[in-house]
A protein has these predicted regions:
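Cytosolic regulatory regions of ion transport systems
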Residues: 1-124
Length: 124
C-alpha cells in the first residue's frame, strides 16, 4: 500500500487512536490543535504537529501542506460549532476529501449537508 498524507484536526482520544494506527501503517501524519500541550503530546509520533485554531480560516490557510493532504480528518465531536466552522474553512480552502467525527444524529445530518466525504461515530 502506498503511503498517504493525512491531517488530523482536534486532538482527543479518537485522534490519538487514528494517529497511532495510520502511523503504524506507514502513512504521513500532520496534527493540528489550538492547545499547545495537546500538540506537544502528539509531536513525537507524527511527522508534523501544528498549533493553530481551525475555526480561523486565516490560520489554516497559513499551513501550506494542509491542502495537499490526501485526507483531512476532523476529530472535533463535542464542540459542534468548532466542528462546523472547521469544515467550512476546509471546504473554502479547497480540501477535497474530508472525514469528520460526529457526536449525534443532528451533527451527522449537518455534516452530510456540508458534503463531508466520510463520517464516523466513535461513541456508537
Amino acid at each position: 500500500m502506498a503511503s498517504r498524507q493525512f491531517v488530523i484536526i482536534g486532538l482527543g482520544n479518537s485522534a490519538n487512536y487514528l494517529a497511532r494506527h495510520l502511523t503504524s501503517l506507514g502513512h504521513d501524519i500532520m496534527v493540528i490543535d489550538s492547545h499547545p500541550e495537546k500538540v506537544q503530546d502528539f509531536a513525537s509520533m507524527v511527522s508534523q504537529a501544528v498549533v493553530a485554531d481551525s475555526t480561523r480560516k486565516k490560520q489554516l490557510a497559513s499551513i501550506p501542506s494542509l491542502t495537499k493532504a490526501d485526507s483531512v480528518i476532523v476529530c472535533i465531536g463535542s464542540n459542534l460549532e468548532a466542528s462546523l466552522l472547521t469544515i467550512l474553512n476546509l471546504k473554502e480552502l479547497g480540501v477535497k476529501h474530508i472525514i469528520a467525527k460526529s457526536s449525534s444524529a443532528e451533527h451527522t445530518s449537518i455534516l452530510e449537508k456540508l458534503g463531508v466525504t466520510d463520517i464516523f461515530h466513535p461513541e456508537r
